[in-house]
């Protein structure tokens, strides 16, 4: 197999202690997939980074804010946040996001 495989059962869930948890899935230098779980009311504080990010809602409901504009996202919805834009999310209903980053997030590997 020339591809990079990550079995969900082998990916460690890191509990942040704030109602969120991250599970780094398959990745290489150019791309990273991360499963992020949220309890209702938990949030990803507004921040910025040099990575382009795509968030896909697997379950739950989220209010996502990019550069001061908010949108509600439900299962099956997705959003792309270009590099350098301020963004954050609030979980309205317990759920899980699949976040894809390019390039990979070195800070998620520590």
List PLM regions with ranges.
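Conserved short histidine dyad/triad with adjacent acidic residue
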Residues: 34-48
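Histidine-centered metal-chelating micro-motifs
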Residues: 43-44, 63, 79, 83-88
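Amphipathic, hydrophobic secondary-structure cores in small proteins
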Residues: 49-51, 78
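Glycine- and acidic-residue-biased ligand/ion/polar-headgroup-sensing regions
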Residues: 51-62, 67
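A cytosolic small-molecule/anion-sensing beta-strand core signal
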Residues: 58-59, 74-75, 93
């Amino acid at each position: 197999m020339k591809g990079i495989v990550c079995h969900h059962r082998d990916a460690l869930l890191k509990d942040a202690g704030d109602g969120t948890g991250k599970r780094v899935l398959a990745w290489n230098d150019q791309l990273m997939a991360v499963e992020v779980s949220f309890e209702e009311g938990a949030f990803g504080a507004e921040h910025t980074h040099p990575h382009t990010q795509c968030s896909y809602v697997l379950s739950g409901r989220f209010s996502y804010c990019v550069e001061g504009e908010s949108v509600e996202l439900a299962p099956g919805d997705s959003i792309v946040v270009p590099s350098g834009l301020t963004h954050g999310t609030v979980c309205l209903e317990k759920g899980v996001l699949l976040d894809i980053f390019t390039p990979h997030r070195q800070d998620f590997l520590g």
